[in-house]
Design a protein with these regions (language model features):
Chain A
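N-terminal glycine-rich FAD/FM-binding segment characteristic of electron-transfer flavoproteins
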Residues: 1-296
Length: 296, 433
């Protein structure tokens, strides 16, 4: 079995510090990490490797420093690492990124056929969740998004069963291989690399692929040129200058009453609208909706 | 089992100086660093003294990320919130290449230095903390234990370059634990300003830079100093005090720094700057008298871990790099001679240090820490007096100059007896001669 895991190096938003006196955000010196969601994907791949002896290849499209993130993956136990880097790739949105990754994965597939491709659910710096699906569509693989758990994997029958979080519940899905899986957080926990892993990561060669290495000829589809989306503006929500109010009362019932009184006092039209709505409901259900106490 | 000629613990200037020199000479070197990458945890003003680095990497100027070369040094005595009495030295020769001192940004510098170490052939492993030393039956250090699984690694010699806390050596009983009396706590901020603004405010251009060292009552009577350095498009400002003093006072280091930034002499210089970074770090300032045993069977201590800091001149990184290099050269020579890394053989490291500026400078100022701890008025009273005297002389108000001088002397005598003044002068001369 051959599994590819696509990762991204991102700034560690948890380590963006706030100055203790002035409360301003300190942007400098924020370390780069492997996108946390990707680590769930990698750990899932490594568990399959532990169980089946699969080969795990990690890859990322990014600037040269992203090599560090790949080495980190090697320290956890990935077998190979490929950095896909080229000046023409910069400024890529998710469409262009999935184009480059899909091309590289096609090349990788020729070297050793791929059975599974993992990505994280999304990145913490973009939050789009579009790259995994983009890869699946481009490669024509099965797509399984928001997967929380792999229940069964049968490489011989080329089949797997996963749990997928969906609105209102969990779906259990069976799929054929090859497939692209985008992993949810929390289903596993990344291992702590042991010392031999650290040595391997420090010593092993990270392969560097430029556009030729990744098998890319159509430069209109990559980088800024291949990116139809542009971020027009980024802004934080304005904090509202409204103070919290305290509602007092001896019992919960009293407090609730005081709260409702206050609400109606502050929003006078609310009382009328609510009553009108209740009347309407009562009319529709012809008595059935009446509170139990009254009907008794 | 992994086995190396040498394991270097820590990737600051001391560890990098050692690892680079060793790897260049062909020894097998493993360097372990607990930070995510070299430099993420390290703090410095930061002034780089070219000489120390040049002796390790002669052509460092070609690739090293340097900010500005220093052409002017200002020494300011300041009170808490009003006055500043200063002296400055600018020298056109400081602008002739090769430059002697530079401002640097440690995070970038350490990363660059570490890249050179890797290129020289050392194996560098980050995010790995050394927890203890491994020893054989006769007590010789034979390797380190890390916090990772299967984490024991062996070497013929371990160089401890783990910085001010020196935990590894203390834990192994190789050196006493560091006390608050020998330790300063410094805080520092990097403030962004456009290059043109820095140039205009400090009367410099190109890559010229200015260094301001600050003493006096800005530390609110505690033993310590402040600084303001010019980077390319930022300023580094910081203040540090002895940890024992800080413990006694209720002021936090951040409050001290905020006070310094509000001082009317500093404020216009940093006006409108955007803070990019703040950090806090310990500085071992015990000086010569606080130096521990520096070597033993299979181990050596270098840099801040050994307490190699010249607090009077705010030199640390150069002593760190130099001691790292000397430790490495000791090992290289022994290996070439086919001699083991026994305590008796490693004593050569101490002898080299003794013959160098490292020990000479530390010895020279060995009485300064005690002087300033025992005579705290040296820091508080004199700066204030100087300020008062200057104000008196410079205020033109119809009072004769002679009368003003008499008033100044009377003020001084009111603060301290004539004998006290003489005693201070003598102590000062003794400590700095
Ligand atoms: C605010 C401030 C301003 C300063 N200004 C100047 C200046 O202008 N010029 C100057 O020359 N000096 C200055 N110094 C002093 C200078 O920073 C130090 O002397 C110098 O950094 C010492 O280098 P080092 O390599 O010994 O220690 P460090 O730079 O502290 O490096 C130690 C390294 O060891 C690592 N480490 C620690 N424990 C372990 C462990 N158990 N396992 C693995 N790794 C470990 C740390 O993460 C760190 O990377 C200043 C210091 C401060 C705090």
């Amino acid at each position: 079995m051959h599994i590819a895991v696509c990762i991204k190096q991102v700034p560690d938003s948890a380590q963006i510090r706030v100055h203790p006196v002035t409360n301003t955000i300190m942007r400098q010196g924020v370390p780069a990490i492997v996108n946390p969601f990707d680590l769930f994907a990698l750990e899932e791949a490594l568990r399959i490797k532990d169980a089946t002896g699969a080969t795990v290849t990690v890859l990322t499209m990014g600037p040269p420093p992203a090599e560090e993130a790949l080495r980190k993956c090697l320290s956890f136990g990935a077998d190979h690492a490929i950095l896909i880097t080229d000046k023409v790739f910069s400024g890529a949105d998710t469409l262009a990124t999935s184009f480059v990754l899909a091309s590289a994965l096609r090349t990788l597939n020729e070297r050793q056929p791929l059975d599974l491709i993992f990505t994280g659910k999304q990145t913490i710096d973009g939050d789009t969740a579009q790259v995994g699906p983009g890869i699946a569509i481009r490669l024509g693989y099965q797509l399984l998004t928001y997967v929380s758990k792999i229940r069964e994997l049968d490489p011989a029958a080329r089949r797997l069963v996963v749990e997928r979080r969906a609105e209102g519940g969990v779906q259990v899905l069976q799929s054929a291989l090859p497939a692209v899986i985008t992993m949810l957080e929390g289903g596993n926990e990344m291992r702590f690399a042991d010392m031999p892993g650290m040595f391997r990561a420090a010593r092993q060669e990270v392969e560097i692929w430029n556009r030729d290495g990744a098998g890319i000829t159509d430069l209109t589809q990559v980088g800024l040129k291949g990116s139809p989306t542009a971020v027009a503006q980024v802004f934080g929500p304005k904090p509202k200058a409204v103070k919290a109010q305290r509602i007092e009362g001896a019992t919960p019932a009293e407090m609730a009453e005081a709260f409702v009184d206050k609400l109606f006092a502050d929003f006078p039209q609310l009382e009328g609208e609510l009553l009108a709505h209740l009347d309407q409901l009562a009319g529709q259900d012809s008595g059935l909706a009446a509170p139990q106490g009254e009907s008794a | 089992m992994e086995k190396f000629d040498v394991i270097v613990v820590g990737a600051g200037p001391a560890g990098n100086g050692a690892a680079y020199t060793l790897a260049k000479a062909g020894l097998s070197v493993l360097q372990l660093e607990r930070g995510e990458s070299p430099g993420t945890k390290n703090v410095q003003g930061a002034i780089l003294y070219a000489d120390a680095l040049e002796k390790i990497i002669p052509d460092f100027r070609e690739t090293c990320p340097l900010e500005r070369h220093i052409i002017e040094q200002r020494m300011w005595l300041m009170d808490e919130d009003q006055t500043c009495t200063g002296m400055s030295y600018r020298d056109a020769r400081f602008s002739q290449e090769p430059y002697n001192r530079y401002t640097i940004i440690r995070a970038r510098f350490d990363r660059w230095f570490s890249d050179q170490v890797k290129k020289a052939g050392a194996l560098v492993v980050c995010e790995t903390t050394v927890t203890e030393l491994l020893r054989n039956g006769s007590g010789k250090v034979i390797g380190v234990r890390t916090e990772r699984e299967k984490g024991d690694i062996y070497a013929d010699c371990v160089i401890l370059a783990d910085g001010a806390n020196a935990l590894v050596g203390s834990r192994a009983g190789l050196r006493p634990e560091i006390t608050a009396d020998d330790m300063a706590l410094a805080v520092k901020e990097v403030l962004f300003l456009p290059k043109e603004t820095v140039d205009a405010r400090f009367n410099i251009s190109g890559t010229q830079g200015v260094v301001i060292e600050i003493a006096g009552n800005v530390t609110h009577g505690m033993l310590g100093t402040g600084f303001l350095y010019t980077n390319k498009d930022s300023l580094a400002i910081g203040i540090g005090c002895m940890l024992s003093d800080m413990k006694k006072q209720s002021l936090t280091p951040y409050q001290l720094l905020e006070g310094l930034k509000r001082h009317p002499t500093i404020k216009p210089l940093i006006e409108g700057a955007e803070m990019k970074e703040y950090s806090a770090h310990l500085i071992p300032e015990g000086g010569y008298k606080a130096l521990p045993q520096l070597y033993g069977d299979g181990w050596m201590i270098v840099g801040d871990a050994a307490g190699f800091v010249n607090a009077v001149h705010r030199e640390g990184s150069n002593l760190a790099m130099t001691s790292g290099r000397m430790a490495a050269e000791t090992l290289i020579a022994l290996k070439a001679a086919g001699k083991p890394y026994s305590a008796a053989n490693l004593a050569a490291y101490k002898r080299t240090l003794d013959d160098s500026f490292v020990m000479a400078d530390l010895k020279k100022y060995q009485d300064v820490p005690t002087l300033l701890t025992e005579q705290p008025h040296m820091l508080g009273m004199y700066p204030r007096f100087l300020g008062d005297a200057a104000r008196e002389l410079l205020t033109v108000d119809g009072v004769s100059k002679r009368a003003k001088q008499q008033k100044i002397m009377a003020d001084l005598k009111g603060k301290r007896s004539l004998l006290g003044l003489l005693g201070d002068a003598y102590r000062f001369w003794r400590a700095f001669r």
